[in-house]
Amino acid sequence: MLKIMLAVFLGGGTGSVLRWWLGLRLNPVHHAIPVGTLTANLAGAFIIGAGLAWFNRMTHLDPMWKLLVTTGLCGGLTTFSTFSAEVVFLLQEGRIGWAGLNVALNLFGSFMMTALAFWLFSSLSVR
């Protein structure tokens, strides 16, 4: 159990630091869309799609690795709470269109990235 907790902890810490760095570097890029948060959510969605497809095929791997990547890394990297707060801030500023675009980009973009990665990694041949 301690090994599993450590894997989730390490993955989560890595994902959280990466999310913080993306926000720091990319959120100032656009005046209304928090690009760092969007990038973190889309990257995390792609990684979890790829990870789920990969780990479904690589059944011989220790389940700890799946937890490190999916629960840990992706859980730390992606952020529904920050995304939600940023949408609320846009709404409070009267930027309804930007808030709607941010919702669409994060939600539909994440679904598409997960599906794309799952499809791509499911179609790879295992050697």
Curated annotation (Swiss-Prot):
Transmembrane segments: 4-24, 35-55, 71-91, 101-121
Alphabetically ordered keywords of this record: Cell inner membrane, Cell membrane, Ion channel, Ion transport, Membrane, Metal-binding, Sodium, Transmembrane, Transmembrane helix, Transport
Signal peptide coordinates: none
Annotated positions binding Na(+): G75, T78
Membrane topology: Multi-pass membrane protein
GO cellular component, one term: plasma membrane
Gene Ontology molecular functions: fluoride channel activity; metal ion binding
Keyword Zinc tagged: no
Subcellular location: Cell inner membrane
Catalysed reactions, as listed in the record: fluoride(in) = fluoride(out)
Main location: membrane
Family that this chain belongs to: Belongs to the fluoride channel Fluc/FEX (TC 1.A.43) family.
Identification of the protein by name: Fluoride-specific ion channel FluC
Originating species: Cronobacter sakazakii (strain ATCC BAA-894) (Enterobacter sakazakii)
